[in-house]
């Protein structure tokens, strides 16, 4: 089964918070951020409500690989990962979101043909972490889904972003990708839409079974607990 990202990167993709309470998350519980603080998303000053933007149509024919744009997205990805793992991020997520909006307005969603698979994954990760701009995050999900339907984006990425948007709204998630840490154990950030079908749906998106994923996240949550986070 294809793995969406190395284990070290899973925290940034699906781990939404750590806590001290017993039991899993419920629909009424407030989502927590990467460091455990309350983080119910509030639109930032750079949200679509404050700065209008319009995506270009998805380009699927006659698209030439853009090395410069690929390299720019990969550099944005590296800065994102530095910020997610406690490193130096002088750019900040708002600037990356605004730049991704500009890219989408000019090119449409960055497709595999345009920027390669790693460049497309980089664009998705920036959208995945746009929690303080939920309107953009939801719009990015629509664009990413359209690209996946055209074979120009990963269905695994769609699954993660779909769950991220749902969990951010306090809604049930489909694939169980969004997780919180509770006493050193991985717990679903919000309940599942179809618990009996989750592994079937995950398989269609190219993801490992949920118990395998949770076992990996358990290791990360245990490490975070030892660090006192």
Regions found by a protein language model. Name each.
Residues 33-78:
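N-terminal low-complexity, Pro/Thr/Ser-rich intrinsically disordered segments
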Residues 62-111:
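N-terminal secretory signal peptides
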Residues 96-99, 122, 136-140, 157, ...:
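Stable alpha-helical elements in mature extracytoplasmic
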Residues 162-163, 188-220:
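Amphipathic alpha-helical packing elements
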